[in-house]
């Protein structure tokens, strides 16, 4: 699973996800991409599950790019713990994804396989997605 090697701060504030993506809205590497239609926080586990589903469908042919990185530490307190006494330990890492952001790209496979792989990857994510083609 993806996680940052080094962090400037151990814990982060909750923050909000931007409504529209300012960058990363165009396909940069591959021929097909998976674009987000909602804004959401995606965990490293969800990214890994989507990657595995897509790569398995592609039968390890072609190339697959992940365009988002889970750099935000999300902390959580144990259940049935009283208020106060600190923020809680880091539970997982997440990436903030805005509307219009390209999440994954792939290349080197036929259009049918690419669409099927990206549909499987999109089913693993908590956002509505759409498959886009380069130059479309």
From Swiss-Prot:
Annotated GO biological process: translation
Keywords tagged on the record: Ribonucleoprotein, Ribosomal protein, RNA-binding, rRNA-binding, tRNA-binding
The keyword rRNA-binding appears for this protein: yes
Disulfide linkage: none
PROSITE patterns hit by this protein: RIBOSOMAL_L16_2
GO MF term (any one): structural constituent of ribosome
SUPFAM superfamilies registered for this protein in UniProt: Ribosomal protein L16p/L10e
InterPro entries the UniProt entry points to: Ribosomal_uL16 (IPR047873), Ribosomal_uL16_bact-type (IPR000114), Ribosomal_uL16_CS (IPR020798), Ribosomal_uL16_dom (IPR016180), Ribosomal_uL16_sf (IPR036920)
Gene Ontology CC annotations of this record: cytosolic large ribosomal subunit
Family: Belongs to the universal ribosomal protein uL16 family.
Role description: Binds 23S rRNA and is also seen to make contacts with the A and possibly P site tRNAs.
Quaternary structure and interacting proteins, as annotated: Part of the 50S ribosomal subunit.
NCBIfam families on file: rplP_bact
Protein name, as recorded: Large ribosomal subunit protein uL16
Species the sequence originates in: Orientia tsutsugamushi (strain Ikeda) (Rickettsia tsutsugamushi)
Recorded name of the encoding gene: rplP
